[in-house]
Amino acid sequence: MDSKELSNGMKITEIDIPGVYVFETPKYRDKRGTFTVPFNLKEFKEATNFYADFVQDNLSTSKKNVLRGLHYQLKKPQGKLVRVIKGSVQDVIVDIRQKSPTFGKSFSIILSSKNNLSLWVPPGFAHGFLSLSEGTQFFYKVTNDYSPENERTLLWNDPELNINWQTDNPILSEKDVEGKVLKECTLA
């Protein structure tokens, strides 16, 4: 993994799946509290070579052990910049770009309000997270509008993906229970 530090102190690391980046944002403290800059378009573009035209910000609040995902969209794939405002999650992505040398590879990272990390998930990935604390607030920016007719769910515990989730018994939506294994998924 290759890391670089920007002029504002933010560290950016490209993981071993091309196009995926972890951002470590500095948190400045003084007697008044803290201040951080979670996103700067110019620095994001320079670091990722991707112009992110974010169209919407989303915030979900989850109970402990809630697992959301693994979601993706067919015709209108979303890039996502994700972070935790309160609590912590195990964030997981799966490369579903059929022509990618890392197709089917997963990546897992702990994101929390304490470690101040963000993850850039480019279009072409399934994404999900497991809430590790009560009342976790998960914030994410997306590059395409939500498209229910294009949304699909990759089964969270597909044995082929070998994801080491930090629970065996998550709280799931009906949609996520009915996800498909990768070899049965419709991909763009």
Model-derived segments and their meaning:
Residues 2-114, 135, 140-188:
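Non-catalytic, conserved peripheral segments adjacent to functional cores
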Residues 111-134:
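Conserved metal-binding segment of the jelly-roll/cupin
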